[in-house]
Amino acid sequence: MKVGIDFGTTTSTICRVTADGRIDTQGPIPSLAAYGNGKWYFGEDAEQRLAGEDRAIYPIRDVKLMLGKKSIRIGPNQLDPEEAVSKYLSYLAGRIAKGEVIEEAVIGTPVNVDMAHRQALLSAARKSGFKEVRLVYEPTSALAGAIDLSRLDERALVLVVDWGGGTLDVAVVRKDGDTLREIEVDGDVSDLGGSRMDDELVREVLQRDASLRSKVDAIDGGFDRLKQEIEGSKRNILEEGIDDETAEPWRTPSLWLRETIEVRPADVFDVIRRMADRARERIINFLHRARINPSEITHLLFAGGVCNSPIVQKAIGNEFRSARAVSTDQQPQLLTGYGAARLARSGFTVQLAAPFGVRQCDDSFCEMLPAGHGLAVGAYRVAEFMVTDVLAPEAVFDLGICRQINGESAMMSAPGDAFRSIDQLHIRAQSTPGENKANAGDLIRLFCGIDSTLAVTVYAESNLTADSVRKSLSGVPLAIRVGR
């Protein structure tokens, strides 16, 4: 069986490809775990446990953002986040697999999480019993879930805004035959997600009630547990269609606190507006860095739970008045999982969308990996660079992508408007600065490749100093070729 999964920070979706090619969807499902008395609880069961009186049940929120860390503190317990995610993915699979073996799982991943995060996610998924696990960027997966690729005009330039509980990811995508080609991608991890909105609402509630703050502070896991209840109040205010900011507070009896929690609609709308304004600024800055004028965007797709808000859609959409909204029957928060299932059904390959390499001080560009280079474990390309500056204690390599592909030569001009720097790599080039004379044998070798984590890894070694440096880079634009 094949599945597509959107493992979200606050909600998740799992979609099953049936034997006759249909896609069954379950979601949104709370991305919530709880742990207490040696037992795990997930999803709605975790919500119910946390709403009860037992204070020895501890919430595990936002565990997606903890992947890559060695341990997390949950109440008095130290737990492995990879184990928590593995158990949660098994729980998701159990809701839809009905005892069948999951042969392939396609899982969405935020654009800018690091390699350690993705390695931990892949490991957790395999521990859950998934035989083959593949990753795709969440916004492009959402686009695959929203459209029929055969009907997308190749002249269309689509901006995908995928805003969920933990991340704001954006991608500018163009269709190129049977390929979804990412022109540029970017992502914010944990700063603008819907979970941060809940943090601000919790602070608003606690600032108004000092006695409540004292109670929450005295309980292990109290802040996260209160945050869970306030998130529910926020969701109810939005789903009930309350649009009067002067309306009465939403009141929720809290059994574990023995208090009634009040959340004001005015606070909810104020927080959403502030976050929407920050998101709009980030998107405009992203397009500016990509040298894309907002007027060039022909289509706009909103994905993720936060984008359900009319306030968010209006704040961002006003910058793209000439763009057409991508129409879809799916809810915004279901698109990434549904798109992942579509990709699993049709088959796909992942390639670099643009050449990756090194820009040097004379603006020349040494291409390390060409556009179209596919994912392959252990398949590295090598380039050698002579050490020519005998006074410099270290060599500096500017790593990034070149948006222009001029001919077949590996050496090309990469001026500022064509090259986007992603990171720099520094390596010691001399044992004693200023005393060594450069010669033809003084070399720094760069090994470069991209693997199933979607991260480009660059490994540098100096034959003069025997130093070596390894760096992994996320956020490289990719091309998704649909079909087998």
Kindly label every feature range from the protein language model.
Residues 348-484:
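Acidic low-complexity intrinsically disordered segments
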Residues 85-99, 139-150, 270-300, 309-315, ...:
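Phosphate/ATP-binding catalytic cores across multiple sugar-kinase/actin-like superfamilies
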Residues 1, 134-161, 289, 334-349:
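Conserved phosphate-binding catalytic cores of ATP/NTP-utilizing and phosphoryl-transfer enzymes
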Residues 1-23, 149-183, 442-462:
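Gly/Thr-rich phosphate-binding beta-strand-loop-beta motif of the actin/hexokinase/Hsp70
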Residues 129-141, 313-339:
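Conserved phosphate-binding/catalytic loops in two-lobed NTP-binding clefts
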Residues 47-60, 64-67, 74, 190-317, ...:
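Gly/charged contiguous loops adjacent to phosphate- or pyrophosphate-bearing nucleotide/cofactor binding elements
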Residues 1-72, 134, 188, 193, ...:
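Early-domain small/polar-rich strand-loop-helix modules and first-structured segments
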Residues 18-128, 199-243, 405-407:
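Phosphate-binding loop and its immediate beta->loop->alpha context
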